[in-house]
C-alpha cells in the first residue's frame, strides 16, 4: 500500500464526543497519509442523530453533504441542507447538525489545521 493512499476499509471508525448516532472515519490526518495541515473525514449520521452545539476554537471546518438532509444551526439560525451543499464553520463559531428523516446523512468533512485527536473537538 502506498503511503499517500488511504483505503476506507483500513480506517477505524469512531464516534466523536458530543455526537449521537454518528460514525466517522479519518481518511487523511496526521498519522494516516502524512498530512499535517488539514484533515479529511468521512462522516455518517443516522436519522435523529446529531452533533450537539459546539465550536472549534483552533480549527476551521468545511462540510460537504454527499447524501441525506440535515438541519444545520449556526449561531442560533437554522437552515436545511442536502446533497451538494457545503457548510463552512469558521473558528469559534457555534454550530450543530441534526440528521433529518430519510437516508443517512453522509458528509465529507475537512478541518484545517487538523484536530489533535478524533476525541477532541
Regions from the PLM with identified roles:
Residues 42, 88, 103-118:
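A short hydrophobic beta-strand segment most commonly corresponding to one strand
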Residues 1-37, 119-120:
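A short, N-terminal "cap"/entry segment at the start of jelly-roll beta-barrel domains
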Residues 30, 51-57, 98-100, 119-120:
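Short histidine-centered beta-strand/loop micro-motifs
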Residues 76-91:
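Short acidic-glycine-tyrosine-enriched beta hairpin
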Residues 53, 72-73, 89, 95-102:
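Short beta-strand His + acidic residue motifs that chelate non-heme Fe in jelly-roll/DSBH
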Residues 58-60, 64-70:
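Glycine- and acidic-residue-biased ligand/ion/polar-headgroup-sensing regions
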Residues 26, 41-56:
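Conserved short histidine dyad/triad with adjacent acidic residue
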Amino acid at each position: 500500500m502506498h503511503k499517500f493512499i488511504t483505503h476506507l476499509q483500513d480506517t477505524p471508525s469512531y464516534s466523536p464526543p458530543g455526537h449521537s448516532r454518528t460514525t466517522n472515519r479519518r481518511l487523511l490526518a496526521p498519522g494516516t497519509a502524512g498530512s499535517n495541515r488539514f484533515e479529511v473525514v468521512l462522516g455518517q449520521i443516522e436519522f435523529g442523530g446529531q452533533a450537539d452545539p459546539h465550536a472549534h476554537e483552533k480549527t476551521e471546518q468545511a462540510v460537504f453533504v454527499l447524501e441525506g438532509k440535515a438541519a444545520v444551526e449556526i449561531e442560533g439560525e437554522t437552515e436545511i441542507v442536502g446533497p451538494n451543499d457545503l457548510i463552512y464553520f469558521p473558528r469559534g463559531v457555534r454550530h450543530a447538525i441534526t440528521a433529518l428523516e430519510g437516508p443517512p446523512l453522509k458528509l465529507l468533512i475537512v478541518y484545517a489545521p487538523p484536530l489533535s485527536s478524533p476525541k477532541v473537538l
